[in-house]
């Protein structure tokens, strides 16, 4: 965020790169293969699948499941929006001053990108911890014949 005032487009690009890194690390953690040049949407889809976060995996017979399905769908949109924001306004493609997309991005968009990504990353890492705890608990039950 220290660059948000002087170079918000760079912050947006770095935030998108961080999200992509988190997705890939989660997939690697679970031994899931991904295409090295897979787009953000595909990577997030794989992450959601391995963590059981797809909206269709939620129990829609109760209020929590219905609400979770909505929120998870919106999280996907946040991630997709981050990708679009970076592609349009980020510095990942080395735009010159006269090229399309070389507009000055207001700091508030860098703040939005970082804030949204932070929430998503925290949620994903907490979910990884929970999934790992559940798997460990299942292994303990199997070890003791439960």
Language-model segments: what does each one mean?
Residues 1-73, 77-80, 127-145:
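Amphipathic alpha-helical interface elements
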């Amino acid at each position: 965020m220290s660059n948000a005032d002087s170079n918000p487009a760079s912050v947006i690009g770095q935030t998108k790169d961080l999200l992509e890194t988190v997705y890939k690390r989660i997939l690697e953690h679970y031994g899931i293969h991904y295409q090295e040049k897979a787009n953000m949407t595909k990577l997030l889809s794989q992450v959601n699948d391995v963590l059981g976060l797809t909206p269709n995996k939620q129990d829609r017979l109760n209020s929590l499941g219905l609400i979770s399905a909505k929120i998870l769908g919106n999280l996907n949109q946040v991630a997709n929006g981050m990708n679009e924001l970076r592609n349009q306004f980020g510095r990942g493609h080395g735009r010159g001053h006269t090229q399309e997309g070389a507009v000055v991005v207001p700091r508030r968009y860098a703040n939005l990108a970082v804030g949204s990504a932070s929430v998503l990353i925290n949620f994903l890492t907490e979910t990884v911890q929970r999934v790992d705890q559940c798997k460990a608990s299942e292994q303990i039950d199997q070890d003791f014949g439960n």
